[in-house]
């Protein structure tokens, strides 16, 4: 291949990689989309009152638009409907690489539009903080669902709810066994019984380690209850969940969950 043709083909390949989104929709995925994404799952713990509006304004007017300019998205922003700590805002930020995770803060610092739009939040005094505490976890997507799956009806802002679940294990070996169980069989049963996944991830850095975290989406609580009942009654699930090495008693030490609702500007 001549040098000019080689350079042209290399640039085209680079452009395709750069424009690739860390998402997939119903259907197949390309070879590049099989590379697992990284997710930052952020929680803003708030006090009722001015902190709620201040944080919402910041995310809507500054953070989400800035992430979009950086090619990061779709970003999910959720309020807690049912959970142990309310009000808490959850933010799900997808990345295609660890380099993206590491570089984002510096890139936002250099974004004048972000700094201006978010000034009221970013420059609060210590005597009047924007939140009680922010927590963050870094997750690696599962092999069987390597990218975010955007729920149907997001563009039309259809009503929807989300269930965020965390499965803790007593050891790394047990944790990896539960990941294997999901990858090899359990996620397929989820899909068949109407439990629609948004993401599954192994928590690399965060609290309650070792754990895996995943998110499901439903039209409403009635659909949630109906589809979980179908899953629990499924013969394949009953067989899988009683298979030696895959029982909860062997590989899961605690399960916690929260129900979330998307903000009007959430991209999920």
Predicted regions and their residues:
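Hydrophobic, ordered structural segments
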Residues: 45-55, 61-69, 74-155, 171-173, ...
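Intrinsic-disorder/low-complexity, polar/charged segments enriched in Ser/Thr/Lys/Arg/Asp/Glu/Gln
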Residues: 37-41, 88-90, 160-164, 211-213, ...
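N-terminal export signals
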Residues: 2-25
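Short, low-complexity, Pro/Ser/Thr/Gly-rich segments in the mature regions of secreted, periplasmic
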Residues: 257, 261-267
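C-terminal segment of N-terminal export signals and the immediately downstream linker at the start
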Residues: 18-47
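Anionic, Ser/Thr-rich low-complexity intrinsically disordered regions
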Residues: 7-8, 35, 53
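Surface-exposed interaction/gating patches
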Residues: 45, 49, 141-221
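Short, glycine- and small/hydrophobic-rich beta-strand elements in well-ordered beta-sheets
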Residues: 22-33, 64-90, 96, 184-213, ...
